[in-house]
Curated annotation (Swiss-Prot):
It holds the Pfam family DUF2715. InterPro entries: DUF2715 (IPR024471). It comes from Treponema pallidum (strain Nichols). This is Uncharacterized protein TP_0617. The lineage of its organism: Bacteria, Pseudomonadati, Spirochaetota, Spirochaetia, Spirochaetales.
Amino acid sequence: MCSFEHGGWYVPKTVLSLLRRRKCQDARAESEELGITGICQNYAVPVQLGVQHYFGAHWGIDATATVSFGVDTKLAKFRIPYTLRVGPVFRT
Protein backbone atom coordinates (compact mmCIF):
# COMPACT_ATOMS: atom_id res chain seq x y z
CA MET A 1 0.00 0.00 0.00
CA CYS A 2 1.19 3.47 -0.76
CA SER A 3 0.04 6.95 0.10
CA PHE A 4 -1.78 9.32 -2.21
CA GLU A 5 -2.71 13.00 -2.46
CA HIS A 6 -6.37 14.00 -2.18
CA GLY A 7 -7.47 17.62 -2.43
CA GLY A 8 -4.02 18.93 -1.51
CA TRP A 9 -3.83 16.77 1.62
CA TYR A 10 -1.49 13.87 2.17
CA VAL A 11 -3.58 10.78 2.94
CA PRO A 12 -1.55 7.84 4.29
CA LYS A 13 -2.61 4.26 3.71
CA THR A 14 -0.90 2.83 6.79
CA VAL A 15 -0.19 4.04 10.30
CA LEU A 16 3.54 3.73 9.68
CA SER A 17 3.35 6.00 6.66
CA LEU A 18 1.45 8.51 8.80
CA LEU A 19 4.22 8.49 11.39
CA ARG A 20 6.94 8.77 8.76
CA ARG A 21 5.31 11.66 6.96
CA ARG A 22 7.82 14.38 6.19
CA LYS A 23 6.08 16.67 3.71
CA CYS A 24 3.04 18.89 3.76
CA GLN A 25 1.41 20.61 0.82
CA ASP A 26 -0.10 23.37 2.93
CA ALA A 27 2.38 26.06 4.00
CA ARG A 28 0.59 26.52 7.32
CA ALA A 29 0.94 22.83 8.11
CA GLU A 30 4.72 22.66 7.76
CA SER A 31 5.15 22.70 11.51
CA GLU A 32 3.10 19.54 11.94
CA GLU A 33 5.71 17.22 10.46
CA LEU A 34 5.73 13.92 12.22
CA GLY A 35 8.64 11.83 13.33
CA ILE A 36 8.56 8.12 14.02
CA THR A 37 8.01 8.83 17.72
CA GLY A 38 6.38 12.26 17.48
CA ILE A 39 2.82 13.42 17.42
CA CYS A 40 1.17 16.21 15.50
CA GLN A 41 2.02 19.59 17.02
CA ASN A 42 -1.15 21.17 15.65
CA TYR A 43 -3.16 19.63 18.45
CA ALA A 44 -3.01 20.78 22.05
CA VAL A 45 -1.27 18.46 24.48
CA PRO A 46 -2.42 19.35 27.98
CA VAL A 47 -0.17 18.45 30.88
CA GLN A 48 -1.97 18.53 34.20
CA LEU A 49 -0.29 18.66 37.57
CA GLY A 50 -2.11 18.94 40.87
CA VAL A 51 -0.58 20.04 44.14
CA GLN A 52 -2.48 19.67 47.37
CA HIS A 53 -1.51 21.38 50.58
CA TYR A 54 -3.08 20.93 53.99
CA PHE A 55 -3.04 23.98 56.21
CA GLY A 56 -1.70 23.12 59.62
CA ALA A 57 -3.25 23.58 63.02
CA HIS A 58 -0.92 26.51 63.71
CA TRP A 59 -3.10 28.62 61.37
CA GLY A 60 -6.19 27.62 63.30
CA ILE A 61 -8.07 26.33 60.24
CA ASP A 62 -8.65 22.85 58.95
CA ALA A 63 -8.78 23.30 55.18
CA THR A 64 -7.05 22.15 52.03
CA ALA A 65 -6.02 23.98 48.88
CA THR A 66 -5.53 22.31 45.51
CA VAL A 67 -3.71 24.07 42.68
CA SER A 68 -3.90 22.60 39.18
CA PHE A 69 -2.25 24.00 36.09
CA GLY A 70 -1.70 22.79 32.55
CA VAL A 71 0.70 23.68 29.77
CA ASP A 72 -0.88 23.87 26.35
CA THR A 73 1.64 23.69 23.50
CA LYS A 74 -0.04 24.72 20.29
CA LEU A 75 2.42 25.63 17.53
CA ALA A 76 4.97 27.03 19.99
CA LYS A 77 2.43 29.19 21.81
CA PHE A 78 2.36 28.58 25.52
CA ARG A 79 -0.49 29.29 27.87
CA ILE A 80 -0.82 28.15 31.44
CA PRO A 81 -4.38 27.89 32.70
CA TYR A 82 -4.67 27.33 36.42
CA THR A 83 -7.33 26.76 39.02
CA LEU A 84 -7.22 27.21 42.77
CA ARG A 85 -9.70 25.49 45.05
CA VAL A 86 -9.89 26.05 48.78
CA GLY A 87 -12.26 24.02 50.86
CA PRO A 88 -12.73 22.45 54.27
CA VAL A 89 -11.37 19.06 55.23
CA PHE A 90 -13.97 16.66 56.58
CA ARG A 91 -12.51 14.07 58.89
CA THR A 92 -14.41 11.00 60.04
